[in-house]
Amino acid sequence: MAKQIEADARTAPVDISFLMAAHNAAPWIETAIRSALDQAGVAVEVLVVDDGSTDGTASVLARLAAADPRIRPIPLDAAGTHAPRGPSAARNAALAAARGRWVAILDADDLIVPDRSHTLLDLAAATDADLIADNPIPFTGAFDPGGAGMLDRCREPYLFTVELAQYLTCNRMLTPGVKLGYLKPMLRADFVRRHGLRYVDTVRVGEDFLFCVAALAEGARFVVSSYAGYGYRRGPASLSHRLRLADIEHLDAAFAAYAEGGALAGHRARSAGIRQASRAYRDSLATAQVIARVVEAAQGGRWLRGAALALARPRAWRFLTGSLMAAAGKRAGRRLRPAMPDALPAGPR
């Protein structure tokens, strides 16, 4: 009987395939998986890729999968002994195995509320969206579904569409405002397959942003709602909590490849607005790389080298001096000493 139930679950139609990359997520992954399984009014599967975890994540996943056939552990060839390959490779493995009409991103340390999937599917049907996203609610301790979202909440719900130039502009590094790259969209699986969309394996931070750029460049209709149903956990466990130089370099190389070839290159050739937005985004990455090099130099005691790097790029200098002044203000009343940030603020997740 148990085998028949499992076989039925493997062949039954699926509305949404949740793609979950997990690395050392043992404290949170059960909450994340159960939140996906508890979606109301939709048939789901949860495809979980354990990416070289060493903290018991695999044991938690095995226990949950044994109890519910909708949970599908997806193998991933390791880069080495317990060496994680990164979220992009893990997402690609899950994406290749997905059976749902839609695919949805759910990080292993996040969660979603029970009516999220049904609500977003209804909105997608009403707006003919290929990508649909809601308003993430950041949290650090206990999740409050009524908490403040990243986007403004109004008395009346609202929707807006996201164009390619707008998406590039709002996701520039080191600029104020909401980064739409933090959104965790659901995507029509047939659109993804039709255009051969995949994650860039080398990118560990900003992978969802790049995936959405590729989708928009292929003509996807991207709709965002003020409805808030995704709980986004902030904290050191999040890959996007900090950006290191290597992260930015990989993101820059991947974006450059997009900009110089494929669908995005065609948009840049035809649209001055997209050319400008693309250049501005890459310029922000260049500034972020300089800042990361300054931080590395300062951490190694090479202060003069760091100062020279910053002075050579005025935007980097302004950002760093502003950060130091803000840090000094927080230490008012105490002895001040120079302090460098140990990493950059997070960019698109």
Question: What residues fall within each predicted segment?
Answer:
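C-terminal subregions of glycosyltransferases and related glycan-biosynthesis enzymes
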Residues: A2-K3, L210, A217, F222-R349
